[in-house]
């Protein structure tokens, strides 16, 4: 009987050890699954925040630039009014009331465009900027810095800081060196 008791005593500690190892392994496995689930949940929350942020940015851009096509179409009207004022004689008494009406209409257009963040680009005298200007011609000039805008054919416009239409300009270049004449060489 003592032998049996000793055998049972030897087996009893092994069984709990085996069961404890199984439980420890199971706890570790469950902890790993929990950590993976928490990580996945954090990633999903981050993805959801990113989607929400992108959607808010898209809505903001849509609000900012919804007027882009409409504003672009109005620029032709502004250009026509400006050309009409340039072509008409301010001293001609017969058209003076019409000129005043055109000036007031143009001022109203300019004020309205500014209210909706449409900003005119009139770069005369400024350095040429290919991101905002379109060079229509180059002209030699001794008085202007090479690479600067000499004349503006058509003003450009920005809508909320983004280019709506480039300014069409004439860009200065350095005068060509004239070869010395025969008289100067002699």
Swiss-Prot record:
Belongs to the GrpE family. InterPro entries: GrpE, GrpE_coiled_coil, GrpE_head. The keyword Zinc does not apply. Residues 1-20 are annotated as: Disordered. This is Protein GrpE. Participates actively in the response to hyperosmotic and heat shock by preventing the aggregation of stress-denatured proteins, in association with DnaK and GrpE. It is the nucleotide exchange factor for DnaK and may function as a thermosensor. Unfolded proteins bind initially to DnaJ; upon interaction with the DnaJ-bound protein, DnaK hydrolyzes its bound ATP, resulting in the formation of a stable complex. GrpE releases ADP from DnaK; ATP binding to DnaK triggers the release of the substrate protein, thus completing the reaction cycle. Homodimer. The gene is grpE. GO terms for cellular component: cytosol. Residues 1-15 have a biased composition (Polar residues). It comes from Pseudomonas aeruginosa (strain ATCC 15692 / DSM 22644 / CIP 104116 / JCM 14847 / LMG 12228 / 1C / PRS 101 / PAO1). GO terms for molecular function: adenyl-nucleotide exchange factor activity; protein homodimerization activity; protein-folding chaperone binding; unfolded protein binding. It is found in: Cytoplasm. Disulfide bonds: none annotated. Keywords: Chaperone, Cytoplasm, Stress response. PANTHER family: GRPE PROTEIN, GRPE PROTEIN HOMOLOG, MITOCHONDRIAL. One of its GO terms (biological process) is protein folding. The keyword Cytoplasm applies.
């Amino acid at each position: 009987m003592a032998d049996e008791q000793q055998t049972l005593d030897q087996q009893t500690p092994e069984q709990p050890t085996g069961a404890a190892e199984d439980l420890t392994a199971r706890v570790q496995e469950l902890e790993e699954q929990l950590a993976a689930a928490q990580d996945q949940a954090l990633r999903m929350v981050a993805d959801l925040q990113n989607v929400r942020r992108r959607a808010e940015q898209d809505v903001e851009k849509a609000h900012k630039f919804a007027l882009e096509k409409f504003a672009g179409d109005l620029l032709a009207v502004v250009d026509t009014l400006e050309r009409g004022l340039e072509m008409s004689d301010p001293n001609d008494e017969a058209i003076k009331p019409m000129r005043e009406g055109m000036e007031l209409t143009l001022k109203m257009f300019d004020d309205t465009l500014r209210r909706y963040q449409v900003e005119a680009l009139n770069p005369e005298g400024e350095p040429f900027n290919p991101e905002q200007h379109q060079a229509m011609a180059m002209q030699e000039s001794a008085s202007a810095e090479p690479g600067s805008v000499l004349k503006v054919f058509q003003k450009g416009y920005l809508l909320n800081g983004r280019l709506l239409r480039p300014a069409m300009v004439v860009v200065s270049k350095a005068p060509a060196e004239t070869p010395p004449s025969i008289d100067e060489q002699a």
